[in-house]
């Protein structure tokens, strides 16, 4: 059985049907009463939702010990009333959990520009926050979904020193996926004891290598937010580089797992695409090239159609003149098949390339051969299903 957030000691979570959606759980809470640190990464969208602004402000001064989450309504572009509704959600949740309102974050996802049905939310909150019912992480993973087809859950653990350190997380996302500091909604918990400053740095590093390397449709949401709570069960030495690197790698692993699950469940997707860029002169170059390929509608549609037109890859790789790249030294592979070597096409048969494109996971490797920096990005193919889902969404 898959482990969830609530399999980490000191973490409580669940969800309930409040009526925001027609017939599914749509209101959830994560409660970490003993949290010693919390961290968050947020969208930089100019129309950031009130939940983003409120939670970001709380994190600057306090350690969050809970977050109240709703799906089906973004509460974005809803003016002063939207801000008041966000604050009310935090205040009422805090009362029920015996916390300060500044210790409760708020996260929302769904349709933009529609007021929250506060009477439904306030009616459901007391039942949701009953301590005896806060033991269902799986239900919460389902409640945060919108156009997603599947729940997205991760649970990672590793020995650091003599302690078993755990990181668990849930996320949602299927469309409007192109990150700017975060992507969609994501919630992580870990049993480490570190300072807020260190946890924030580690989360930011993990997001930069995972969620920020993810693209379904190049659209950035108004509500993007990833939060992380530390229960404080096991201390790791913040001055010990080996221990800190081990924790950073564990957090990276959890975030990458969640990001790949989002890409695989992209709206209308039939194929997961992974673009690995290696031997670039700078990390920024490797990252930019990977994102250019994963963002390209021409690449996405070619992969969906299993079309071995590799010229679209070359277009995407080289379209930014600021990247330090020598076209005469670039190698490109699709799966195990080398299609470009030293900037020129190989004599590979189109049928061999098409065979690679029939797989469910498409690996594209770009070897710049002139440096030591690497980056990986994830996305999915672009299909008619994407259009159908978004014309029907309301």
Predicted regions and their residues:
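A structural signal for small-residue-enriched, beta-sheet-centric alpha/beta enzyme cores
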Residues: 1-70, 74-84, 94-119, 123-394
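Generic structural marker for isolated residues within well-ordered, non-membrane alpha-helices
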Residues: 90
């Amino acid at each position: 059985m898959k482990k969830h957030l609530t399999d980490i000691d000191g973490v409580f979570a669940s969800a309930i049907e409040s009526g925001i959606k027609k017939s599914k759980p749509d209101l959830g809470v994560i409660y970490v009463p003993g949290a010693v640190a919390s961290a968050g990464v947020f969208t930089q969208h100019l129309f950031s939702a009130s939940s983003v602004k409120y939670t970001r402000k709380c994190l600057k001064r306090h350690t969050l010990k809970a977050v109240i989450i709703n799906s089906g309504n973004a509460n974005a572009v809803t003016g002063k009333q939207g801000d008041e509704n966000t604050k009310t959600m935090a205040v009422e949740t805090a009362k029920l959990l015996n916390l300060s309102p500044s210790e409760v974050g708020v996260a929302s996802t769904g349709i933009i520009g529609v007021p929250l049905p506060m009477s439904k939310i306030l009616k459901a909150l007391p039942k949701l926050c009953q301590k005896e019912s806060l033991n269902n992480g799986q239900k919460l993973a389902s409640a945060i979904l919108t156009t997603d087809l599947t729940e997205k859950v991760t649970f990672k653990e590793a020995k650091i020193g003599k302690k078993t350190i755990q990181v668990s997380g849930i996320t949602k996302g299927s469309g409007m996926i192109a990150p700017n500091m975060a992507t969609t909604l994501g919630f992580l918990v870990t049993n480490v004891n570190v300072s807020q400053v260190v946890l924030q740095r580690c989360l930011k590093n993990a997001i930069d290598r995972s969620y920020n390397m993810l693209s379904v449709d190049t659209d950035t949401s108004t509500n993007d937010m990833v939060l992380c709570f530390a229960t404080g069960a096991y201390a790791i030495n913040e001055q010990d580089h080996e221990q800190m690197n081990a924790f950073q790698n564990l957090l990276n692993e959890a975030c990458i797992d969640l990001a790949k699950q989002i890409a695989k469940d992209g709206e209308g997707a039939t194929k997961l695409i992974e673009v690995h860029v290696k031997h670039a002169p700078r990390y920024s170059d490797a990252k930019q090239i990977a994102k250019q390929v994963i963002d390209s509608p021409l690449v996405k549609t070619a992969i969906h159609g299993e079309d071995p037109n590799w010229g679209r890859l070359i277009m995407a790789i080289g379209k930014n003149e600021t990247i330090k790249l020598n076209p005469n030294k670039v190698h490109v592979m699709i799966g195990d098949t080398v299609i470009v070597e030293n900037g020129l096409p190989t004599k590979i048969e189109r049928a061999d390339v098409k065979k690679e494109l029939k797989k469910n996971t498409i690996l594209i490797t770009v070897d710049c051969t002139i440096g030591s920096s690497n980056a990986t990005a994830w996305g999915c193919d672009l299909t008619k299903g994407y259009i159908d889902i978004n014309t029907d969404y309301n």
